[in-house]
Amino acid sequence: MRNSTTIWLAAADSIFNLLPSMNKGEYTMAQNPIVTIEMENGDIIKAELYPEIAPNTVKNFISLVKKGYYDGLIFHRVINGFMIQGGCPDGTGMGGPGYSIKGEFAQNGFANDLKHTEGVLSMARSMMPDSAGSQFFIMHKNAPHLDGAYAAFGKVIEGQDIVNKIATTQTDYSDRPLKKQIMKKVTVDTFGVDYEEPEKC
């Protein structure tokens, strides 16, 4: 009887480790994709992506990363106490990949309750809900007014101090860093999982 109980507990523990856990609006799942952003100066930011929260957004981000889309791009908009934004191919905040995806957030009819807390990754967009393409931002500090209005899809697991450093760099009147904050190389580890191309608008 003791052996069967031990086996059952071990099995239950294995199942538990595969399930998403929720704590104060934070999510984690074993073997979720991990994105690594290597800055030009050698600094590293690592973030876990949440396909269970924003599946098409994650597919889109992974697709762009695998194509080398973000390599050499900059964080063109930096606001201390708020967020750092990058992913524009022309570095102005006006560019994108040539397509858009559906906004996976509550105000657009999609159940996504990931909060915009420190370190969370989310998709930038225009006033139109389905206008996100490649631009994303990383939260420097909590911004609850964004909750439900933007497609949050991941969170920094290593290098939040680098995010903080970028967020406090000197900027001009348009929130553009005076010294370019360049993403030298962006890679992703999907741990053997194949992610399809995203659905596009």
Enumerate the predicted regions with their spans.
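Cyclophilin-like peptidyl-prolyl cis-trans isomerases
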Residues: 14, 20-201
